[in-house]
Amino acid sequence: MNIRNQQMMDWLQDVGLHSRSIAPASADASFRQYFRVRTDSGSFIVMDAPPDKEDTGPFIRVAQRFREIGLNVPEVLEQDPVKGFLLLSDLGQQTYLGLLNASSVERLYGDAMGALMVLQTGSYSDPDFLPQYDRPLLLTEMSLFRDWLLQKHLGLDLTDEQLRVLQDTFELLASNALEQPSAWVHRDYHSRNLMRTDEHNPGILDFQDAVLGPVTYDLVSLLKDCYINWPREQVENWVKGYQKLSLESGLQVTKDEKEYLRWFDLMGAQRHLKAAGIFARLYHRDGKAGYLADIPRTVGYISQLRDLYPELTPLIEIIDSIDWTAVTRVSRAS
């Protein structure tokens, strides 16, 4: 047993939890780890967030507020921010990703979009509770695609013209995000962070990076998921249905279907540039190769927009010139 695990065991004893078994529950794209602790009184989750690398404060604060507005997120039962340990209620082991198929998707996504509406309408009670998703952050995120995926991982020597195209497109996508109405944004609202629960489905995880930002961001995270994809026609129907629900719920969104879909699609391009860059960074910086296989799907969402948005053509030409089968060759430059 390593020192950190021993510290966790000692802390559990300190808070009066006597475990029958402890096993890894999951790890995410950060330095956090999660363990499932089984006791005579039930099952719990321990978040291990090393304090020199992770701050548990945002998780605690956001969890409390999200529970107050009616979302099914873990309850923080015990906390020690100094040591970096939280004891959480257990939302189970059934991720959306493991359950989604053609038969289940309408029901599961229906519940997820209902919860998303609770999140977005809840933001009107206190919009300043979360930090702004501003232009510098949007641009920094997209730069990960250039720096970590194209240059670091694929080893591309980008021309001045290609660099200009990338920067111009980054600015365009940031402007699209900022012209949208704002609501609370989970920021990773996808199938690996949604749990199927018997009551109050879905359970929602990994919300500590939430911000106040573009109203289509979480919707595109859900419907253009980096880990599972659906036919374009089906996605458009979901988007139109959610736009209608948004208007009925009083969200300040456009009534124009074409404009809303453009917001959604270009927001997706921003998110997918960021995500593809993060997947490459996770390999080179953190030694996590498992996300590399998701990069072709992620950038593929952008390529699918070729005939819909001429303003994205220069970016898509760069993307389509790359052999994406090479992305999983982890012997690349490190």
Locations of the language-model features?
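Active-site activation/catalytic loop segments of kinase-like enzymes and analogous catalytic loops
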Residues: R146-H153, V215-Q252, L266-D286, T298-L305
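ATP/Mg2+ or Mg2+-diphosphate-binding catalytic cores
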Residues: G277-S334
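Active-site acidic catalytic loop and adjacent metal/ATP-binding pocket
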Residues: F31-R38, V46, L119, E171-L219, ...
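ATP-binding pocket architecture of kinase catalytic cores
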Residues: R32-L144, L149, L154-G155, L178-E179
